[in-house]
Curated annotation (Swiss-Prot):
Cofactor(s) it depends on: a divalent metal cation
Protein role: Involved in the regulation of the intracellular balance of NAD and NADP, and is a key enzyme in the biosynthesis of NADP. Catalyzes specifically the phosphorylation on 2'-hydroxyl of the adenosine moiety of NAD to yield NADP.
Molecular-function annotations in GO: ATP binding; metal ion binding; NAD binding; NAD+ kinase activity
The protein, known as: NAD kinase
SUPFAM superfamilies (UniProt xref): NAD kinase/diacylglycerol kinase-like
Keywords for this protein: ATP-binding, Cytoplasm, Kinase, NAD, NADP, Nucleotide-binding, Transferase
């Protein structure tokens, strides 16, 4: 296992709990004589930190490990920035759900120490890359660890579009939108829209229509190496949006084409030993426990 010496810290802004956890984490790492680097935006609200600072982009070039303190949204943003650097990312949960940031604050020292001692698991999570083209010219590009979503924006009108997979026509639809999700994102927005839960190790993409105006519109799971093309109807009277992880947004025009495919670089997500995906699903999604209350 890799030995981590240069540790970057990214935190969610606007939370006193996040700042308290970062102070604890900083103290713990320095006591282990490690080189700690703070993301510059969080350093600005942490006076007297006395640490080297760096932009998020450069953290991937100078660190062996980046620790994200926040919720899943914080880790999604970090993943898009750091995947290209092939750097491991570890999450400490200071958000609501915590599907990706799976270390609780009360176990910070114990779990982080185990990771630093080489006791951890690595999951390679793939991302999607999306491009919006107008008259054969790219007008917007973005990456997503969870999902790429076509939606009507501020309008309440439905969107008409066609779907192609690897150049083959699949169907035309009239719906509130379309979700294209990774296995990581299958437990996010796609789940709310009726999509299946996919294990993170699957090399697959799920396409989930949002409230389609038909009884036959159903999610479809395709090979992870597929290239998807979504063509917005030229007769559409609204300007829908494309969102990547709900954080990056692009406005489409009638006739635009959205292509979605797997990004070559993957996120290296670190988990402490003993991480169990099904236990996470039980805890976060409220799945039933064993009959009779057994928890062995």
């Amino acid at each position: 296992m890799e030995q981590f010496r240069n540790i970057g810290i990214i935190g969610r802004l606007g939370s006193s709990q996040v700042l308290d956890t970062i102070r604890r984490l900083k103290k713990f790492l320095l006591e282990r004589h490690l080189h700690v680097i703070l993301e510059d935006t969080i350093a600005e609200v942490l006076p007297g930190h006395g640490l080297q600072t760096s932009t998020r982009k450069l953290l991937g070039e100078v660190c062996d490990l980046v620790i994200v303190v926040g919720g899943d949204g914080s880790l999604l943003g970090a993943a898009r920035a750091l995947a290209r650097h092939n750097i491991p990312v570890l999450g400490i949960n200071r958000g609501n759900l915590g599907f990706l940031t799976d270390i609780r604050p009360d176990e910070l020292e114990e779990k982080v120490a185990a990771v630093l001692d080489g006791h951890y698991l690595v999951e390679n999570r793939f991302l999607l890359q999306a491009e919006v083209r107008r008259h054969h010219e790219a007008i917007g590009q973005g990456d997503a660890l969870n999902d790429v979503v076509l939606h009507p924006g501020k309008s309440t009108r439905m969107i008409e579009f066609e779907i192609y997979i690897d150049g083959q026509f699949v169907c035309s639809q009239k719906a509130d939108g379309l979700i294209v999700a990774t296995p990581t994102g299958s437990t996010a927005y796609a789940l709310s829209a009726g999509g299946p839960i996919m294990h993170p190790k699957l090399d697959a993409i799920v396409i989930v229509p949002m409230y389609p105006h038909t009884l036959s519109g159903r999610p479809i799971v395709v090979d992870g190496n597929s290239e998807l093309k979504i063509v917005v109807s030229k007769d559409l009277q609204i300007y829908p949006q494309v969102s990547c992880d709900g954080q990056n947004h692009f406005t489409c025009a009638p006739g635009d084409t959205i292509t979605v495919s797997k990004k070559p670089q993957k996120l290296r997500l670190i988990h402490p030993l003993g991480h169990n995906y099904y236990e996470v699903c039980r805890t976060k999604l409220g799945w039933g426990s064993r009959l009779g209350g057994r928890d062995d």
